Amino acid sequence: MEAEEPPEARRCCPEALGKARGCCPEALGKLLPGLCFLCCLVTYALVGAALFSAVEGRPDPEAEENPELKKFLDDLCNILKCNLTVVEGSRKNLCEHLQHLKPQWLKAPQDWSFLSALFFCCTVFSTVGYGHMYPVTRLGKFLCMLYALFGIPLMFLVLTDIGDILATILSRAYSRFQALLCLPHDIFKWRSLPLCRKQPDSKPVEEAIPQIVIDAGVDELLNPQPSKDPPSPSCNVELFERLVAREKKNKLQPPTRPVERSNSCPELVLGRLSCSILSNLDEVGQQVERLDIPLPVIALVVFAYISCAAAILPFWETELGFEDAFYFCFVTLTTIGFGDIVLVHPHFFLFFSIYIIVGMEILFIAFKLMQNRLLHTYKTLMLFVCQREVSLPW
């Protein structure tokens, strides 16, 4: 005979199963929006690569019969005189003549393969735009503008969602590191806590006092307690009118609690998974705003992140050293994209697409913390100046 399970195990199994069923919708609700955004971005990049490869990759039959190109080549032959001896004057004329070279004359169909077009699409919706690859046809230019019009907001949506994940990871990692080393909370001076989180008790005095008086009852307003400085009659009339207007507004408006309950908990109709997805969509971008990490820590993360890519990139881009690779990665992640460094093998760099997205978000977090710190410094300076002006005798 088989051994029967103890009653405690029977009771624990349904409880554990219930907890697992409850956690699965929440986990899916957190991961599903980000995965959907990322899948949409990948699909958008693939569709754009196919379109640009078809539009810009077509051979131009009129390129060989272009009169401007023929005249350019004839003048070039006249300058060179079809020999290898070039005098100083002819060299100067040659440099001036080459400045009239148009990029569409050098266009080749193999330059717009599917992978090259995919690399171009990544530079468009990421707003990097290196500059060495761009459309030259009229249809390609209009298609590029339309593609960027929808691709850039989609890219920012993906960055915002990934930013919440990175903010959560960085915040928890720093908290555990701080607890492991038993560090005090104010060990770093450059923290962004006063600006990232608004204190609930930081309301102005002129807003807090009328709110307290209005919340009082009518009897308390009509029969106030005796005090040393009795309020003026005009102040009492104004406060009484505010109280009456507020009571009328509360009577005219229907109770909103049932409506808020039905709107905030659509799981009664849509299910727990749908409710979790909707609630997570409403909270997109909130984790970055609540992030509280010292600036030296995030600066160290940025330096380590760029250094890793700068050490790996020269393995296939042999012409780049560590310094040039570090400069290229920084220009890419900050979306500056000068275009002064051109990758010989951009197809391999496509594997760094996730690296670029994550790196752009890390730099955005660093810039956000720096912005908060500068704003805090500016506010402190303004408060100091205002206090000096108040203390000065007039």
UniProtKB/Swiss-Prot annotation:
<feature type="region of interest" description="Interaction with YWHAH">
    <location>
        <begin position="261"/>
        <end position="266"/>
    </location>
</feature>
<feature type="binding site">
    <location>
        <position position="128"/>
    </location>
    <ligand>
        <name>K(+) 2</name>
    </ligand>
</feature>
<feature type="intramembrane region" description="Pore-forming; Name=Pore-forming 2">
    <location>
        <begin position="326"/>
        <end position="340"/>
    </location>
</feature>
<dbReference type="GO" id="GO:0046872">
    <property type="term" value="F:metal ion binding"/>
</dbReference>
<comment type="subunit">
    <text>Homodimer. Heterodimer with KCNK2. Heterodimer with KCNK10. Interacts with calcineurin. Interacts with YWHAH, in a phosphorylation-dependent manner.</text>
</comment>
<dbReference type="GO" id="GO:0071467">
    <property type="term" value="P:cellular response to pH"/>
</dbReference>
<dbReference type="InterPro" id="IPR003280">
    <property type="entry name" value="2pore_dom_K_chnl"/>
</dbReference>
<feature type="transmembrane region" description="Helical">
    <location>
        <begin position="347"/>
        <end position="367"/>
    </location>
</feature>
<feature type="binding site">
    <location>
        <position position="128"/>
    </location>
    <ligand>
        <name>K(+) 1</name>
    </ligand>
</feature>
<keyword id="KW-0479">Metal-binding</keyword>
<keyword id="KW-1015">Disulfide bond</keyword>
<feature type="modified residue" description="Phosphoserine">
    <location>
        <position position="264"/>
    </location>
</feature>
<feature type="binding site">
    <location>
        <position position="130"/>
    </location>
    <ligand>
        <name>K(+) 3</name>
    </ligand>
</feature>
<feature type="transmembrane region" description="Helical">
    <location>
        <begin position="32"/>
        <end position="52"/>
    </location>
</feature>
<feature type="topological domain" description="Cytoplasmic">
    <location>
        <begin position="368"/>
        <end position="394"/>
    </location>
</feature>
<feature type="transmembrane region" description="Helical">
    <location>
        <begin position="142"/>
        <end position="162"/>
    </location>
</feature>
<dbReference type="Pfam" id="PF07885">
    <property type="entry name" value="Ion_trans_2"/>
</dbReference>
<feature type="region of interest" description="Selectivity filter 2">
    <location>
        <begin position="335"/>
        <end position="340"/>
    </location>
</feature>
<keyword id="KW-0406">Ion transport</keyword>
<feature type="topological domain" description="Cytoplasmic">
    <location>
        <begin position="1"/>
        <end position="31"/>
    </location>
</feature>
<feature type="transmembrane region" description="Helical">
    <location>
        <begin position="293"/>
        <end position="313"/>
    </location>
</feature>
<comment type="function">
    <text>K(+) channel that conducts outward and inward rectifying currents at depolarized and hyperpolarized membrane potentials, respectively. The outward rectifying currents are voltage-dependent, coupled to K(+) electrochemical gradient across the membrane, whereas the inward currents can be induced in response to activation of Ca(2+)-mobilizing receptors. Homo- and heterodimerizes to form functional channels with distinct regulatory and gating properties.</text>
</comment>
<feature type="region of interest" description="Selectivity filter 1">
    <location>
        <begin position="127"/>
        <end position="132"/>
    </location>
</feature>
<dbReference type="GO" id="GO:0097623">
    <property type="term" value="P:potassium ion export across plasma membrane"/>
</dbReference>
<dbReference type="InterPro" id="IPR013099">
    <property type="entry name" value="K_chnl_dom"/>
</dbReference>
<feature type="glycosylation site" description="N-linked (GlcNAc...) asparagine">
    <location>
        <position position="83"/>
    </location>
</feature>
<keyword id="KW-0631">Potassium channel</keyword>
<keyword id="KW-0407">Ion channel</keyword>
<keyword id="KW-0633">Potassium transport</keyword>
<keyword id="KW-0813">Transport</keyword>
<dbReference type="GO" id="GO:0032829">
    <property type="term" value="P:regulation of CD4-positive, CD25-positive, alpha-beta regulatory T cell differentiation"/>
</dbReference>
<dbReference type="GO" id="GO:0006813">
    <property type="term" value="P:potassium ion transport"/>
</dbReference>
<keyword id="KW-1133">Transmembrane helix</keyword>
<keyword id="KW-0597">Phosphoprotein</keyword>
<feature type="binding site">
    <location>
        <position position="129"/>
    </location>
    <ligand>
        <name>K(+) 2</name>
    </ligand>
</feature>
<feature type="topological domain" description="Cytoplasmic">
    <location>
        <begin position="163"/>
        <end position="292"/>
    </location>
</feature>
<keyword id="KW-0325">Glycoprotein</keyword>
<feature type="binding site">
    <location>
        <position position="127"/>
    </location>
    <ligand>
        <name>K(+) 4</name>
    </ligand>
</feature>
<keyword id="KW-0472">Membrane</keyword>
<keyword id="KW-0812">Transmembrane</keyword>
<dbReference type="GO" id="GO:0015271">
    <property type="term" value="F:outward rectifier potassium channel activity"/>
</dbReference>
<dbReference type="InterPro" id="IPR003092">
    <property type="entry name" value="2pore_dom_K_chnl_TASK"/>
</dbReference>
